[in-house]
Structure formats: structure tokens, C-alpha cells
Amino acid sequence: MPVVTMRQLLDSGVHFGHQTRRWNPKMKRFIFTERNGIYIIDLQQSLSYIDRAYEFVKATVAHGGTVLFVGTKKQAQEAIAEQATRVGQPYVNQRWLGGMLTNFQTVAKRIQRMKELEEIDFDDVAGSAYTKKELLLLKRELTKLESNLGGIRNLTKAPSVLWIVDTKKEHLAVDEAKKLNIPVVAILDTNCDPDEVDFPIPGNDDAIRSVNLLTRVVADAVAEGLIARNNRGSGTTEAPEEPLAEWERELLEGSKAEEAAAAAPAENAEAPAAPAAEAPAAAEAPAEDAK
């Protein structure tokens, strides 16, 4: 069963790009045509890139990774918070603070400050050690901290992957991820730079329905990864520690090929007595994998 169908992409308007005068020439290979001054994105490519990103996110989470959902534009705020919360992942949907990743120690102190303020009973003025004015100021501080840091309150270290809606608006997040070699999975509209993203998904990053659909797909990948992680943890083998970013990149590209190569000699060794009868079947297996 496909991760998402062509009909779903069409109904959500994923194929609509920006006006032809607002584009990045590097996105030319992802553009299908132009209609009424608007670029139309090639959804066949989008489907392929969605599958690739889905498998990567699922594999990363299955091996103990964390996905940080990022989208501060109005069209993305609700979907980012809803889908990230659904699968228990951190998110930023109000404002990206400079140094949120590269200076995480300072951010962690602000998160701790937020948790300390949450312990205060702002309604009990008489039993508090603060004056009414001080409580009001502390309440305002808490509200601001919750707005900026509430989505990452349980984040204890840099995430394994970033899911980003609109890489142009979230350029600070993209830059910090690059410095730390954290892979970026993102929607690529026709005005974006594909060189900034490790796992691009060509699509509309402005329409609410498009953002909702693609963010839900990424959250579904996280959910599958969590299930696989739990299944692995309940078995005899322990799940490995959170992988490094470079290892995560290699995981999606190389694991399937290695498994297929290791399985072929084992099958041949088990049935040496009937080479003639099983030769056609052995020859067909690689062809099916190639599809």
C-alpha cells in the first residue's frame, strides 16, 4: 500500500508552485509545466521522494532517533503541533530562536526556567512568596517561554532529523542543522534551494491542506518507526543507541542492498541438490527486488 496516493496529492494542491517570476532555477528538474503564470510541480517525482523520505524517517526513529518538527508560518503552526504531539516528537511552531540547536545548552537553561515557573501557583497570591506585581511579571515570562519552548520541553539533546515546512522562512533552522550535520527532510516549493535539503519533497509549502497532508505523512513514518523500535526492544536484541547523522544517511541507501546480497548465498547453500529446478526462481528474485 502506498504511503500517499496521487489523488490525495492532487486534492491537497501539492502540485501548485509559486508564480513563474518567483522561482529558483535549481528547481527546474522538479517542475512539470507552467499554467496561468504558476509552475506545476511534477507529482510523479513527489511520490518517489515521499517514499524515500518516509523510509528514512521510519528507519531513523526505529533506531532510537528523534524528529524535530519545524514550521512557524501560520499555515503550518497547527499541523506541526498536532502531528508532532500525536507521535510524541518535539516541535517549533511559533519562533525559531537563534542557537536553538548550535547553542542548546543555553536553550536547555531556559527550558529549566520554564519548568520552574510552572511550579508556581499564580492564583494563590496570599500563600505566595511574591507580590501581585511580581506574579504578573512571572506569568508573562512563563507565557513567553511556553510559546517559544513549549514544544521542545522534553528535548534533551540535538534531534536526529529535522522536518521543515518552508526552508526559506526557516533558514536559521536549516543553517544550524547543516553545522551539526543533522539531516533535513523538507517540502521544496518552486522558490526553494534543493541543495539545502537532504531529503526533499517537491510540493506546495503554502497551502494548508498540502502542509497538513505532508506533515501527517512524516508523522506516520515516525509512528511506524516507534512501533518497530518497541518490537525490537521486546525481543532478544537490544535497540542500538541513537545513530549519528552520517550513519543515518547510509542506513536508508545501503541496508536493503546488503540484506539482499546476504540472503542470496544462504538460499543457494540450503538447496544444492536441485540447482536446475531452482535456477529460474533464483534468477527472478533479483529482478523483483530491482522494481
UniProtKB/Swiss-Prot annotation:
Sequence segments annotated as region (Disordered): 231-291
Key words of the record: Ribonucleoprotein, Ribosomal protein
Statement: the UniProt record of this protein carries the keyword Methyltransferase: no
This protein's record includes keyword Oxidoreductase: no
UniProt cross-references to InterPro entries, sorted A to Z: Ribosomal_uS2, Ribosomal_uS2_bac/mit/plastid, Ribosomal_uS2_CS, Ribosomal_uS2_flav_dom_sf
Gene3D superfamilies: Glucose-6-phosphate isomerase like protein, domain 1, Helix hairpin bin
GO terms for MF: structural constituent of ribosome
A GO CC term attached to the entry: cytosolic small ribosomal subunit
Domain of life per record: Bacteria
Record-level GO BP terms: translation
Pfam families: Ribosomal_S2 (PF00318)
Signal peptide (residue range): none
SUPFAM superfamilies per UniProt: Ribosomal protein S2
Compositionally biased region (Basic and acidic residues): 246-259
PROSITE patterns, per the entry: RIBOSOMAL_S2_1
Composition bias type Low complexity, residue spans: 260-285
Similarity section: Belongs to the universal ribosomal protein uS2 family.
Protein known as: Small ribosomal subunit protein uS2
Organism listed in the record: Pseudarthrobacter chlorophenolicus (strain ATCC 700700 / DSM 12829 / CIP 107037 / JCM 12360 / KCTC 9906 / NCIMB 13794 / A6)
Lineage of origin: Bacteria, Bacillati, Actinomycetota, Actinomycetes, Micrococcales
